[in-house]
């Protein structure tokens, strides 16, 4: 049995993570202005919680980081909609405006005593270990570990959302992109990183490795769901095959009462929308659906093998 994925936004988890009314109020405002960003924040919070579990973080840190993941983009409520929701690439000027969501979110949190403990999440989640991030160009250990976790979760969900994945097939391609961000930029290898024998990319490689585990969990969860659906399809196929056998017996009988007996049995087994005329097509569609789903499962297991071989 596979455990269900953590649903951060459920009332049970909101209670267990002690999100007080002021935080929910701020998030409701964010959702009203930009549902897309709110959903992204929910996904990041979910990932942060699960990453912390794999990183064996203390519960208090996990709670803090999970809430921080939810609040990391709260500054976007101040970004003009025409920039925030622009479908194409931002201009340099628009990008500079977009970057201010970090400082705006920080100011919002610092202005409210209940949000203040989470103020560094909006501020630091775009900082990079190699110093190329914003807004302050922090490096290495100057970036809070919690913000490093949020950055990995944020980048992963941003790529997955942009590509509109409906399955984890080919999800390893997303992880390969993140691996590039965990590796040092070749342009900097001749500089101070090489001199100190320290090589940093933009994101934390250890956190990324644990993201691999989270993704594998999600793949197994998807496989479990597909297998449940296949079992349902098999039950339907079994029922329709029984109908098919009754139909053959009716066709082979010369007795009208016997024919009607089997036809009545067929009608009793029909579900809504099924008839004597269309059930063979329905049966064929179910059989094809099983083959298709089994193929997806094979692809998903292949993804797991690929992910397990990934190196940072």
Across the structure, where does each feature detected by a protein language model lie?
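Histidine- and acidic-residue-rich, metal-dependent catalytic cores
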Residues: 2-311
